[in-house]
């Protein structure tokens, strides 16, 4: 059995956890915006097609 030590993990590293969550959220939004641009909207690798999406007519 491992001995437990009162090491303050959350108290010390909370800024890194918050920053990691913010970066994850920002990259997710950037990827969504990028996949819906004119250049990539009809790419067969777009996740929209896995959900049954149709091709979009681009001007």
From Swiss-Prot:
Segments forming a coiled coil: none
Statement: the UniProt record of this protein carries the keyword Transport: yes
Localization, UniProt: Mitochondrion membrane
GO biological process, one term: mitochondrial proton-transporting ATP synthase complex assembly
Membrane-spanning residues: 9-25
Keyword Ion transport included in the entry's annotation: yes
Membrane topology: Single-pass membrane protein
Keywords from the UniProt entry: ATP synthesis, CF(0), Hydrogen ion transport, Ion transport, Membrane, Mitochondrion, Transmembrane, Transmembrane helix, Transport
GO cellular component: mitochondrial inner membrane; mitochondrion; proton-transporting ATP synthase complex
GO MF, one annotated term: proton transmembrane transporter activity
Family: Belongs to the ATPase j subunit family.
Role according to the record: Mitochondrial membrane ATP synthase (F(1)F(0) ATP synthase or Complex V) produces ATP from ADP in the presence of a proton gradient across the membrane which is generated by electron transport complexes of the respiratory chain. F-type ATPases consist of two structural domains, F(1) - containing the extramembraneous catalytic core and F(0) - containing the membrane proton channel, linked together by a central stalk and a peripheral stalk. During catalysis, ATP synthesis in the catalytic domain of F(1) is coupled via a rotary mechanism of the central stalk subunits to proton translocation.
Miscellaneous remark of the record: Present with 6540 molecules/cell in log phase SD medium.
Subunit description: F-type ATPases have 2 components, CF(1) - the catalytic core - and CF(0) - the membrane proton channel. In yeast, the dimeric form of ATP synthase consists of 17 polypeptides: alpha, beta, gamma, delta, epsilon, 4 (B), 5 (OSCP), 6 (A), 8, 9 (C), d, E (Tim11), f, g, h, i/j and k.
Protein name per the record: ATP synthase subunit J, mitochondrial
Species per Swiss-Prot/TrEMBL record: Saccharomyces cerevisiae (strain ATCC 204508 / S288c)
């Amino acid at each position: 059995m491992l001995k437990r030590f009162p090491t303050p993990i959350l108290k010390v590293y909370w800024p890194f956890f918050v920053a990691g969550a913010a970066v994850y959220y920002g990259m997710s939004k950037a990827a969504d915006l990028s996949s819906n641009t004119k250049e990539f909207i009809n790419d067969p690798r777009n996740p929209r097609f896995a959900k049954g999406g149709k091709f979009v007519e681009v001007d």
